[in-house]
Amino acid sequence: MESGNNKKILNENSAPSISDLKYKTQEKITNNNENNDNRLNKKNLIFYSILILILSLLSFLLYNFILRLITQNNNDKNDLGIEEGKKKRKYEEELEKIKKELEEEKKKRKEEFEINKNKYYKEINKTVVGIDFGSSKSGFAFIIFENNNKILIDEITKEIEFKDYIEKSCIIMKDNKMFEYGNKANKRMNKPISKEYIYFDRIKTNLDPKKLEKDSSNIKIKSSFPDNVEMPLKLIIQEYLKGITDDCLEIINKKGHNFTKKDINWVVTVPAIWNEYGKELMKECAIQAGMENIKIALEPEAASLLLFDDTSIDKKYKEKGKIFMLVDAGGYTIDITLNEIVDEQGNLKQLSPPSGNSFGSMKINKDILNLIQQVISEKSLKDIKKDSFDVYNNLLNQIEEIKIDANDDDSDNKDFIINLNSNSCGWFSSSKCIKRTDFGEITYDNNNIYIPKQVIKNLILKRISPIIDHIKEIYKTFNDINIDLLAIAGGFSNSNILKKEIRKYFPNAKVLKNPQISVMKGAVIYGIIPNKIISRKSPKTIGVSSYSLQRPGKECKDPEIVDGEMKCRYFDIFKRKGEDIFNNEIIEKTYTPLKEDQKDIFFILYSSNSYNPTYIDEEDVKILGSFDLEMNETNLKREERKALVRMEFGANINAYAKNKISGKEIKLKANYYNQN
């Protein structure tokens, strides 16, 4: 029987036929093929299922991986944002902290500045002019202020102006008044001039402190031309100062100002060796010349104030604690001061009182003039001065140039030539001659004198030697301290021979920039910051006279019997020699009248070179000044009537005496430094 599939159903007990076998075989083959196909399909299904599963798994893993990456990235971004936020907040907090600290520091510095503003700024309501009144040349520097200007102290020297040339220290007088001064006067004297004009040269050399008396009004000096005409020294100085201050005022007002001399604070410098009389004379002359607001400064101190801002001096010498010696080499004197830099503003502490001597370079001029006199004879030189002063004046100018220009270069053996214009005199030979002098053989002819270079060098070395010795002596005195720098200022410091000789013995020596104007510029700084030198050394022992019992073992020369007791006038010390003197330092002492009926106390201010003087009658004790204080309260007991003596120290000393009962006070002002 066939099925719908054309298959036969066979009896199991029947024997198969070939056709049946074929059929069965074919069927079996068909079934096998079907089974194989089924198995293959199952395998493919399994394979693809596994593949799909794997791919799904991979997709899942990839998805999760990508998801994690995205999540991580977002988390990282979030973390980064959080971190950045933290950093930003921390930065803002630190910034705020810094701002607060800066505000606090600013506030603190502002408070500190208000307390110590003079360390940084200086308020000035007047223009300041510094005048260096020199032996051969003078000049001025200035700084202009008005309407309470404020200036950084560090900027002061940058603002200082000075004249583009230095004036000769000479003057022509006519009818007791200045006709011309300075370079104009000197130039005029290089030509023949009428004898109605009276010429004074190198005025400052007439101010010998040892010859000046307390009353200097009668001191007269002799003119250079006409020869030996006498005029009052004070008149000559004040007229010269009048000329230089008039010039200064004109230059300042050309800058758009309308100042008078009263609108200016003036500072005039003087040598360290000058005594009180010389300083007082200079001050009186300055006032007469119109300088009402006048201060007197010592030349080496003024130059010292400039050192801190001098660009030619290495910064290592300007540090706190550095010690420098300043040598002011001028024409008349050599002045020296020793200072320590005490802070970053360049304030100074004086380690030794300014000292000096008369070893100035003008002595070299005299030596060269003496040499010329030996060549042409003393009479001939006098005749030239008398009859041909223009030739004589030109001769002096040539000598000044030779002194500065002389050098120590052995390769240059040219003679120095001094021209004497033989047309005005007939004492020279028409041919070259040789003259033997104390300085060697000198050649001359009808026009010129030929001075060998070595002769000039020897003359200069002769005068430099005492300067070197004086500096050595100071080094020896202070051998326990290290002097870092030896600074040289003054006009003579331009001498090549002087510079070489000083450096030979003192390798740390440096010449200030523009040394010829260092004193006048330093004088301006002194006028602005007079307390820049915070302490000085007392060059003398200072005190007043008082009565006491005679000291055992030491008798006074003139004892007095008071109330039955032998008493002496002893030296009551206020400040000892060598002690520090601080600006505005005050020392007070109380005294009573010697007798019951005494109606006044006569105080005398004294100085002494001794560290511990006992009596005022000792040899080196000198009077600086005096004042008489009324004590009329005789109804009171002597012990109740008290007088107070107060001394204020600084650049100068001011002494006061006060009646403590009546309150009346009198003042004595005395500049006491370096009394001779």
Regions found by a protein language model. Give the residues of each.
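Nucleotide/phosphate-binding catalytic cleft detector across ATP-hydrolyzing
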Residues: K97-S135, A141, F145-K150, Y197-F324, ...
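Terminal export signals
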Residues: M1-N116, Y121, F140, Y181, ...
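A short acidic Gly-Thr/Ser loop motif
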Residues: I131-K137, P300, E319-D335, E340-D343, ...
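Glycine-rich phosphate-binding/hydrolytic loop that grips phosphoryl groups
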Residues: C170, E299-I313, N365-N370, L512-S548
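Acidic low-complexity intrinsically disordered segments
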Residues: F113, Y121, E292, G426-K462, ...
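Gly/charged contiguous loops adjacent to phosphate- or pyrophosphate-bearing nucleotide/cofactor binding elements
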Residues: Y197-F200, K204-E213, I219-L235, N258, ...
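Early-domain small/polar-rich strand-loop-helix modules and first-structured segments
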Residues: L80-N218, K295-A297, N347-L348, P354-S355, ...
